[in-house]
Structures are given as C-alpha cells and as structure tokens.
C-alpha cells in the first residue's frame, strides 16, 4: 500500500539512486560509441546513393526511428537467444546489460546516420572541389575535408541525441538491468513511496542532462573557432 508523501524521503533516495548512475552512463557511453560507428557506415550509402545498400539503410533507419525503444529492447533481449539457438548457442542467460547496450547502439546508429548525412549535406560543395584541385582523391577529400566539417555542423544535433539517449536508458530496467531506474523500482517495492522515488529519479536525470547541455554548448563554441581557422588555412593553401 502506498504511504503518505514524505518530502524527506526524496533527499534519502537521491544518493541511493546516484550510486547506480555509473551503470547508466556506462550503457550510454558504449551504445553511443558503437552507434556512431555503425551510423557512419549507414550514412555512407545514403550520402553516395549506393544502389540496394541505400535502400537497406533506409529500411533500417526507418524501423529504428519509427518503433518505440521499449519494443526494440524486448525484440533484442528475446531475439538474440532465439537467433543464437538456431545455431546451437545458448544465450538465454545473457546479462541484460549487453542486450540494453546492443539495443541502444542499434537505435543510436539510426539517429546518427541521419545526423551525419545532414551534416555532410551542409558542407559547401566548393570545399570538395577545392580538395580535388589540390590532388586529393574522393576518399581523402571526404575523410580530411568533408567529414570533419560535417561533424562540426552536426555537433549540436549529436548533443541532442546524447541527451535523448540518456533519457531512453531509463527503460533498460524493463529487461532487468539494475541501473538507476532499476534501483528505483526496487526502492518503490521496499518503501511504498513511489512518487518520492520518481521525483528523486527526475532530479538526478535532470542534473546529468543539464551538465551534458553545458558541456556541448561550451564544446561547440570551441570547435567552431577551430573549424574557422582550419578552413581559412585550407583556403589559403589553395590560393
């Protein structure tokens, strides 16, 4: 039975939940790293309109952007053992942590692919032509000139993706991950103070999100300053 609201319990719950913040951040970090790498590979066929692969990338991105993250969590959590079982490998006792990382990585890849594609599209085509004029190949021009500038343009959206993914990790408890939200569920069961637990959770998540926003805002300003210098030097070398 739910107990009467107690403001003091919020202060007690915050440090208890914060102790599990490293688990949440670990899931977030790994899924962002893997997601960004996969997203880059998904973005390339979209950017260069590679037949068949482009269509497959479109379907992948559409699926992961068009379905709820909780549904994706359950598909991966139950789907991996089902698939590995077909080849005689038993992963039914797999730590749900890995299923959560895999799910968020796959989901982040879809978002990252579109962000990278938009970033590349925002780079002045004259930069690529200038790169060709000094003897760079297509791949060299992309790696050295286009991609760095595209990532700078995409940086604000990347920041939004990180914060969105942070909030999405709050659902990892649904497959048994003991992160902040998972610990919150056990606190609700043991204390019968649901509202206080959710308020405490919101405080911790909000504090982390604000820190991330501040970091990306400061980093964006510094990166844009460096980009201006790099582009200026590149233009001077051409002329």
Swiss-Prot record:
Keyword DNA-binding on entry: no
Alphabetical list of InterPro entries matching this protein: AA_ABC_transptr_permease_3TM, ArtM/GltK/GlnP/TcyL/YhdX-like, MetI-like, MetI-like_sf
Induction profile: More strongly expressed in the presence of methionine than in the presence of sulfate.
GO molecular function, one term: transmembrane transporter activity
GO biological process terms on file: amino acid transport
Protein keywords: Amino-acid transport, Cell membrane, Membrane, Transmembrane, Transmembrane helix, Transport
Localization, UniProt: Cell membrane
Membrane topology (UniProt): Multi-pass membrane protein
Statement: the UniProt record of this protein carries the keyword Membrane: yes
Annotated TM spans: 25-45, 69-89, 96-116, 196-216
All copies of domain ABC transmembrane type-1, residue ranges: 21-216
GO cellular component: ATP-binding cassette (ABC) transporter complex; plasma membrane
PANTHER family: L-CYSTINE TRANSPORT SYSTEM PERMEASE PROTEIN TCYL, MEMBRANE COMPONENT OF AMINO ACID ABC TRANSPORTER
Similarity comment text for this entry: Belongs to the binding-protein-dependent transport system permease family.
Record text on subunit structure and interactions: The complex is composed of two ATP-binding proteins (TcyN), two transmembrane proteins (TcyL and TcyM) and two solute-binding proteins (TcyJ and TcyK).
Role this protein plays: Part of the ABC transporter complex TcyJKLMN involved in L-cystine import. Probably responsible for the translocation of the substrate across the membrane. Is also involved in cystathionine, djenkolate, and S-methylcysteine transport.
NCBIfam families per the UniProt record, alphabetical: HEQRo_perm_3TM (TIGR01726)
Protein's name in the database: L-cystine transport system permease protein TcyL
């Amino acid at each position: 039975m739910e107990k009467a609201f107690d403001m003091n319990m919020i202060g007690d719950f915050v440090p208890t939940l914060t102790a599990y913040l490293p688990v949440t951040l670990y899931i977030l970090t790994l899924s962002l790293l893997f997601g960004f790498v996969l997203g880059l590979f998904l973005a390339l066929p979209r950017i260069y309109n590679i037949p068949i692969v482009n269509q497959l990338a479109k379907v992948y991105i559409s699926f992961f952007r068009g379905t709820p993250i909780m549904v994706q969590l359950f598909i991966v959590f139950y789907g991996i053992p089902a698939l590995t079982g077909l080849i005689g490998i038993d992963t039914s006792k797999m730590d749900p942590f890995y299923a959560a990382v895999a799910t968020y990585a796959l989901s982040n890849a879809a978002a990252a692919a579109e962000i990278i594609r938009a970033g590349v599209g925002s780079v002045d085509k004259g930069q690529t032509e200038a790169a060709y004029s000094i003897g760079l190949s297509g791949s060299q021009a992309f790696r050295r000139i286009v991609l760095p500038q595209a990532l700078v343009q995409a940086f604000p959206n990347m920041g939004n993706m990180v914060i969105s993914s942070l909030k999405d990790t709050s659902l990892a408890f649904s497959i048994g991950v003991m992160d902040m939200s998972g610990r919150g569920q056990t606190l609700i069961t043991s204390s019968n103070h649901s509202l206080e637990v959710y308020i405490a959770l919101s405080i911790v998540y909000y504090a982390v999100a604000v820190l991330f926003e501040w970091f990306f805002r400061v980093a964006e300003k510094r990166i844009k300053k460096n980009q201006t210098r790099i582009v200026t030097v590149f233009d001077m070398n051409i002329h």
